[in-house]
Amino acid sequence: MKKVVTVCPYCASGCKINLVVDNGKIVRAEAAQGKTNQGTLCLKGYYGWDFINDTQILTPRLKTPMIRRQRGGKLEPVSWDEALNYVAERLSAIKEKYGPDAIQTTGSSRGTGNETNYVMQKFARAVIGTNNVDCCARVUHGPSVAGLHQSVGNGAMSNAINEIDNTDLVFVFGYNPADSHPIVANHVINAKRNGAKIIVCDPRKIETARIADMHIALKNGSNIALLNAMGHVIIEENLYDKAFVASRTEGFEEYRKIVEGYTPESVEDITGVSASEIRQAARMYAQAKSAAILWGMGVTQFYQGVETVRSLTSLAMLTGNLGKPHAGVNPVRGQNNVQGACDMGALPDTYPGYQYVKDPANREKFAKAWGVESLPAHTGYRISELPHRAAHGEVRAAYIMGEDPLQTDAELSAVRKAFEDLELVIVQDIFMTKTASAADVILPSTSWGEHEGVFTAADRGFQRFFKAVEPKWDLKTDWQIISEIATRMGYPMHYNNTQEIWDELRHLCPDFYGATYEKMGELGFIQWPCRDTSDADQGTSYLFKEKFDTPNGLAQFFTCDWVAPIDKLTDEYPMVLSTVREVGHYSCRSMTGNCAALAALADEPGYAQINTEDAKRLGIEDEALVWVHSRKGKIITRAQVSDRPNKGAIYMTYQWWIGACNELVTENLSPITKTPEYKYCAVRVEPIADQRAAEQYVIDEYNKLKTRLREAALA
């Protein structure tokens, strides 16, 4: 029996785990002494590992390459040589016929690791010749990256998660740490124990609201109106840090002019928050010696997501809560390596290390390093644009790695149509997902636990994860698969191990250069920027100590007028749907749904959280099946009745197959980042009279879908 150190493959807290291996099989997980988790884990950390053993609770592991010879036909098992040759030939032909931008690729924010994401974006740019590479940050924290880049020059958390423990105030805005990042929630609790004030801003009574000094239960979709009113109070009452504003920022007067029009009284109807509460929150935040803002997708998944990020950041600038310990702006990234996927350049506008593709010097640098004459100068397509790009014939092929857009993207009917329109769909994954079932080519890869590499935690912390067991089937690592396709397409790409890849990318990224494999070791946690390979440089806990990463070193004030969400409530669709997370399952559920303990927590068709008064008015009982309708479709789900949701809104998680709430969500893309407005969809909830028939319908539909995916996986 042995123990292998790794990093949890679920959320981005970056928890260290010891996998206990007996006779070549993982038998349990134990908490390790990681910097963030400090010997603790959540239930996913303890019980979220047995998917690797192909439990087939939900869907089987992919075990051999497969090709679908014609649309409508079955997937057929083939050798690796045949599959890789086929992919190389088809991609080359599409590139030749339609141009490189006819091919869309994705990185993966899950267990593939930073090295694989680096190789994938290099493949897209140097081999295909396109910047069409993206990752799931597009549908979650893309607005955080864009907004923070504009405001402070850096799109990541400005503080270490551990710093939360010793701040004087935690401002939790549009973020549910107990469900999304339980170990981060522990640090919020630590802060409370240490005397910190807690402000929670969320329409629901989330778990953190139970320990909050103040819970601002604002109306769905009113974020900017509230933030502008808080800024108004801080300036009006002379609570802002004049020295910080004068020496380290610019744009204050323009900001002041906008928030002047947002008195607390003027936004009471918009926000549903009293003027006195707004003033109390503004004073509490401004008067704290140090204050850390934590936000999640309750900020970013709105049409005005980027603007909300910048408005939050302006509050921090206004009060001098940047560039010092325990104070800052912190988008707590969702999936375990979504920060890493962005760090590695799995974005359509940046090379690794956030070096922008439109800068000629950056293009020249990476072209030289990768041995190509030139690289494309224009920003690539976003993955959320795929339905539109495919419909207009701009994208003809998609190479999807470790993502399940047919489950996780908005307006799923449009996404399905896009995949039908494509000439070639390549899926590289570990499970037969909905997206994999639509593929023309399946490339089965090793899983977390079967390979090694580096993840980046939400707070910029590089950590190594290690191989625990040998893969049982005919699998290759993700970076090996991509490298072999590149070589077959005439671009020799040969790596012997992940360290060779890591060292290549380090030398191209000054902020990452000092984070060597040796320095990370088993339990090391190196937060970029880390620019020196010496042991003296252990990374950077908090950012902006001396200057901001903007061109002139100054933070940029910004806000704008509040605009109502795009989807409108009507008599036909009188309630708001907001998609959320839950603690027991993760993302598209392909991993957690195949873990025995986690799968036992809940099953299809999932839940719609609904307020007790709304349920009573509609004649809906707790646990009853209901129909939820939107302008884009309808789904069946189970009512979860309580006083936690606000009246007039329902909340659903997106991982369920039958109760797939993304069937309902209208995309309503942000004009800046093309992030869908998952947090505001007009819906109607209807009770179902014949509950017995509805229960049987769920069972039948679930079994049909599981059977279809299992048959596809077994070819």
UniProtKB/Swiss-Prot annotation:
Protein name as it appears in the record: Formate dehydrogenase H
Database matches in SUPFAM superfamilies: ADC-like, Formate dehydrogenase/DMSO reductase, domains 1-3
Its EC number(s): 1.17.98.4
Superkingdom per UniProt: Bacteria
Site (Important for catalytic activity): H141, R333
Domain 4Fe-4S Mo/W bis-MGD-type residue range list: 1-56
Family: Belongs to the prokaryotic molybdopterin-containing oxidoreductase family.
Native organism taxonomy: Bacteria, Pseudomonadati, Pseudomonadota, Gammaproteobacteria, Enterobacterales
Gene: fdhF
Summary of subunit composition and partner proteins: Consists of two separable enzymatic activities: a formate dehydrogenase component (FDH-H) and hydrogenase-3.
A GO biological-process term: glucose catabolic process
